[in-house]
């Protein structure tokens, strides 16, 4: 994820795992806009108390029952312990935008063509990953069978952000224009360079022989360059010349 500093020269304050722009019939795979939050390691998220008795088990899903706003946020890489917990490699650091994994009430799992969903009974950070206990996963063997599953969360379950904070997935596809109104292309991807987020913009161009090609621009997502993000208008305005 990334947080754009609204100051004239402020950097993006938080970092994000590099995303891959990829679709699977759902919203684009996205890393998150990262927001510094209180570390949640050792703090369990208990959603079971709010769930009905019939909602605590894993269930099979279809393409039709899959949420239209599902966003891939990680992958199950291993079992954790002996009691059915799973270990997840999150696409954004746990505690820094991987928070959706901690707060979401239901996880949606895709492995090959098989779709499942399960309530998140408990989830917490553990070192550089997230560990969770999902409904219906009663022992280590069941947890091991979930290895390789890609984890999706409904976009509607992402934690709310403050002013001037954006989830990467919400920036993908937006038109980019400069302050003079010149179109610079569309956001194709977001990159984390370690210091701040970077917009990767694609636009139609031609090579030296006149053949159509896709051009690329990289614009740091910081306040000195990014002036406005209008999600309703699907447009980002930047202080950036077309010939840079």
UniProtKB/Swiss-Prot annotation:
Q: Where does it localize?
A: Cytoplasm
Pfam families assigned? PRC_RimM, RimM
Q: What positions does the domain PRC barrel occupy? A: 163-244
Subunit-level organization:
Binds ribosomal protein uS19.
Biological source species: Paraburkholderia xenovorans (strain LB400)
What does the function comment of this entry state? An accessory protein needed during the final step in the assembly of 30S ribosomal subunit, possibly for assembly of the head region. Essential for efficient processing of 16S rRNA. May be needed both before and after RbfA during the maturation of 16S rRNA. It has affinity for free ribosomal 30S subunits but not for 70S ribosomes.
Name of the protein in its database record: Ribosome maturation factor RimM
Compositional bias ranges of the Low complexity kind: 13-22, 45-57
Q: Which keywords describe this protein according to UniProt?
A: Chaperone, Cytoplasm, Ribosome biogenesis, rRNA processing
Q: Which GO terms describe its molecular function?
A: ribosome binding
Family membership noted in the UniProt record: Belongs to the RimM family.
Q: InterPro entries this protein is in?
A: PRC_barrel-like_sf, PRC_RimM, RimM, RimM_N, RimM_N_sf, Transl_B-barrel_sf
Start and end residues of each stretch annotated as Disordered = 1-58
Could you name the domain of life of the organism this protein comes from? Bacteria
Note what the entry says on domains.
The PRC barrel domain binds ribosomal protein uS19.
Q: GO:BP terms for this protein? A: ribosomal small subunit biogenesis; rRNA processing
Bias class Basic and acidic residues marks the residues at 35-44
Q: One GO cellular component from the entry?
A: ribosome
């Amino acid at each position: 994820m990334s947080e754009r500093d609204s100051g004239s020269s402020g950097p993006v304050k938080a970092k994000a795992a590099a995303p891959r722009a990829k679709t699977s019939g759902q919203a684009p795979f996205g890393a998150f806009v990262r927001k510094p939050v209180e570390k949640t390691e050792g703090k369990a998220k208990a959603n079971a108390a709010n769930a009905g008795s019939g909602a605590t088990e894993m269930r099979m899903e279809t393409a039709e029952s899959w949420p239209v706003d599902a966003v891939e946020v990680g992958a199950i890489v291993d079992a954790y312990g002996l009691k059915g917990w799973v270990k997840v490699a999150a696409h954004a650091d746990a505690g820094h935008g991987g928070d959706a994994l901690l707060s979401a009430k239901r996880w949606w799992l895709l492995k090959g063509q098989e779709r499942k969903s399960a309530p998140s009974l408990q989830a917490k950070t553990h070192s550089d990953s997230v560990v969770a206990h999902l409904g219906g996963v009663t022992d280590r063997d069941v947890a091991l069978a979930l290895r390789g599953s890609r984890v999706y969360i409904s976009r509607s379950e992402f934690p709310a952000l403050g002013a001037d904070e954006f989830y990467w997935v919400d920036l993908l596809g937006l038109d980019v224009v400069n302050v003079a109104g010149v179109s610079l292309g569309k956001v194709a991807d977001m990159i984390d360079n370690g210091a701040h987020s970077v917009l990767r913009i694609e636009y139609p161009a031609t090579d030296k022989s006149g053949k159509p090609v896709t051009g690329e621009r990289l614009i740091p997502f910081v306040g000195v360059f990014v002036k406005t993000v209008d999600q309703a208008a699907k447009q980002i305005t930047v202080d950036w010349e077309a010939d840079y």
